């Protein structure tokens, strides 16, 4: 599985950030260009039925090498990187045999990956770790997953003694902006079940996600010359501040963990005449999720009552739901992944995803899709890193899962 690092380093050279602002599919042209390159690579290693559609979805098939009928399994990763930080000119560095100390990512800018802030890195002492130069994210989310899947299926092609059923490979665009499953053709994909490789540290096995929604708050102010503004001006900046402060201050990402939900203020655009707040709303519990959506709407209503006019408009849109209810119907998909990890000396860590994957929506589209680790940490930022061994073990896990299904 040594090819996984070389593949990964090649993939992150391509800037495939998705965009919240774009209405195109995919949201950025570079994703489609990258999809075409991946399609060519899949053909080159010997996969069949390789397709890259106009929306940037890549699909391919590794044909079964056994006579008996077993479930067709899919392995899925996403091609885009987060728009939260630049993915242009990623300049990775391999820290060989990590010594357990702080890692200076950028001496000139004094950007340091500190063990007291990111203690999880100590779990990889003695291993080779890929880090950034402090200027960009790394792109392990989710190009590590792509590299692992392709490396695994190539290994199966080159080792026909390992028996497996039909395997489907899928790569999606725009996962980071919540659109990864929008145009995914489940019927065309043709899998009975699937796994995304979009998780974090080694051993993570996830079958629960948030219920997720986004909220856009538009505030209409009224600008009047400040010298004569008394009882006339409505300052949208101050109304926005009031709105923000009316939501629970401790129910935010930086103060929650585990199964706790939150309101996350993504952006504020504000001036006297108008303001716009963009939130995401998250909770594992469906009832609490619905209550959160009503809560943010209620804030808008209370402000409108105070001003005795409609100056606040709150629009809420669901994004995805907790896939647990669908995964529980086919629990064996989690059990096999669990057993496969044990078989290759990985201790499974069953954790809820404090986020979402393409599998969240695919599970509700008829394709049960739990999530496996891809190996990275600190996604979406300059402190992102991925241990090389974790990527190699993820590729090995894909092979072992395929093998276990063939032996069921």
Swiss-Prot record:
EC number: 3.4.11.4
Listed InterPro entries: ArgE/DapE_CS (IPR001261), Bact_exopeptidase_dim_dom (IPR036264), Peptidase_M20 (IPR002933), Peptidase_M20_dimer (IPR011650), Peptidase_M20B (IPR010161)
UniProt keyword Secreted, yes or no: no
Chain residues that bind Zn(2+) 2: 141, 176, 380
Pfam families in the record: M20_dimer, Peptidase_M20
Residues annotated to bind Zn(2+) 1: 78, 141, 198
Catalytic activities: Release of the N-terminal residue from a tripeptide
Gene Ontology MF terms: metallopeptidase activity; tripeptide aminopeptidase activity; zinc ion binding
One GO CC term, this protein: cytosol
Catalytic residue positions: 80, 175 (proton acceptor)
Homology family: Belongs to the peptidase M20B family.
Protein name in the entry: Peptidase T
Species of origin: Clostridium botulinum (strain Loch Maree / Type A3)
Gene symbol of the encoding locus: pepT
